[in-house]
Amino acid sequence: NVRRPIAEVFSDIEHANVFFIEPLEYLPFVYMMKRSYLIITDSGGIQEEAPSLGKPVLVMRDVTERPEALEAGTIRLVGTDRDKIFNEASHFLDDKKYYEDNSLIANPYGDGQACSRIADVLDSIPMGS
């Protein structure tokens, strides 16, 4: 669970827009991710979903089972070192260009339009064929 270590790393920060939350149901969680500026996690699923929302992700692990996200630049491995996590998060929070350069990266998992493409193909098949 990443909540306790992150709360310790950022214990000196009191900011109205920083939230340390308990696990949420899926839809409220996606809503929170969409409204977030930066996501810090140890979840493999979030590493896959956050790029669809255009959110940079710091992963509190030393390895990931999502190498395509690492190669694309949609995630950064920061491990569990307090200073490394703080420094990388600060870089995203303090440098607008760095943030933009690292949040406007193409999603390595696709553009989210697969369903529409499949529906178009199915729609083009004549009935009864």
Task: Describe these PLM feature segments.
Residues 2-129:
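Nucleotide-activated sugar donor-binding and catalytic core shared by glycosyltransferases
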